[in-house]
Swiss-Prot record:
It catalyses: L-lysyl-[protein] + 3 S-adenosyl-L-methionine = N(6),N(6),N(6)-trimethyl-L-lysyl-[protein] + 3 S-adenosyl-L-homocysteine + 3 H(+). One of its GO terms (biological process) is methylation. One of its GO terms (cellular component) is cytoplasm. Belongs to the methyltransferase superfamily. PrmA family. Its EC number is 2.1.1.-. This is Ribosomal protein L11 methyltransferase.
Length: 311
């Protein structure tokens, strides 16, 4: 079987939405070539465990690659992808060069091309993310292992926005807490909360592809008894009192439900937000404060920001 490798040269800000667009279009495997990963390995104790090849990374910007089957619908699929990516401009997302190229690869090349980019990654004091095909032995007795399949939708959990969220969850989720995960994507934040001994985790996403992906990942990590995922538009129709709400989505989306998040939290509960590009930090911070929150901490990694707020 023949596969097309779709390569998109873009910005850090656009990586996650473009990756999601590619998965929704039917991509089987997505690769992110980010030169900052090379710097991270040298500077950050939580960097890649394995050596990275600088020749695989661009000099500037980020390259997102996706693999699509060659069929009679390919041209139509690619046109749809281009149109949807261009629509991100409506959300003031910088697409950078937005240069798209297409090349053909065979079955064997496709099967191994994207796997070389993924290895076990320690992203916090407790959590290590491991691709499903890797054999990995925990280094510490209290290490928590999240298994992810990068061939499935919505990435592997090593993007800075996800790392910031998991590090925050590790600090603020207590045993017995009730947690909401808004815009769950892969479900990785719900998995982390469940492994941190939350009593219950309710994950929501409007996209049915994300819901199915999250459901599979919850099952893979054996936390389906604690965490459940449902299709829902943000926090619409959700009731009850919760200890932690986490949302790793675009800043523009977070702005839509800050008041709802406040009303659903117990007194003293925390709202962990991420997916916020640096220049939108102040806008989100002000919206949280206007909703009644107190800002506890603002964390940053590369171009991204996570804001932790308390009711």
């Amino acid at each position: 079987m023949k596969w097309s490798e779709l390569s998109i040269h873009t910005t850090h800000e656009a990586v996650e939405p473009i990756s999601n667009i590619l998965h929704e279009a039917g991509a089987s495997g997505v690769v992110i070539e980010d030169p900052l990963d090379l710097i991270k390995e040298r500077e950050n104790v939580y960097g890649e465990i394995y050596q990275l090849d600088p020749n695989d990374y661009p000099d500037e910007g980020v390259i997102v690659k996706a693999y699509l089957p060659v069929n009679s619908f390919l041209g139509e699929t690619v046109d749809g992808i281009k149109e949807t990516i261009n629509n991100l401009l409506l959300y003031n997302i910088d697409l950078g060069r937005n240069h798209i190229t297409i090349s053909e690869v065979n079955e064997e090349e496709w099967a191994t091309a994207w796997k070389k980019y993924y290895h076990p990654v320690k992203i916090s004091e407790k959590f290590t993310i491991v691709p499903t095909w890797e054999e990995y032995t925990p280094v510490h007795t209290d290490e928590l292992i999240i298994e992810m399949d990068p061939g499935m939708a919505f990435g592997t959990g090593t993007h800075p926005t996800t790392v910031l969220c998991i590090q925050a969850l590790e600090r603020f989720v207590q045993k017995g807490d009730k947690v909401i995960d808004v815009g769950t994507g892969s479900g990785i934040l719900s998995i982390a909360a469940a492994m941190l001994e939350a009593e219950s985790v309710h994950a929501y996403d409007l996209d049915p592809v994300a819901v199915e992906s999250a459901r599979l990942n919850l099952k893979l990590n054996k936390v389906s008894d604690i965490a459940q995922v449902k299709q829902n538009n943000l926090l619409d129709g959700i009731e009850g009192e919760h200890d932690v709400i986490v949302a790793n989505i675009l800043a523009e989306v977070i702005l839509r439900f800050t008041s709802q998040a406040y009303s659903l939290l117990k007194e003293g509960g925390h709202f962990i937000t991420s997916g916020i590009i640096g220049h939108k930090k102040q806008e989100v911070k002000e919206a949280l404060e206007q909703a009644g929150f107190t800002i506890v901490e603002i964390l940053s990694m590369e171009d991204w920001v996570s804001i932790i707020a308390k009711k």
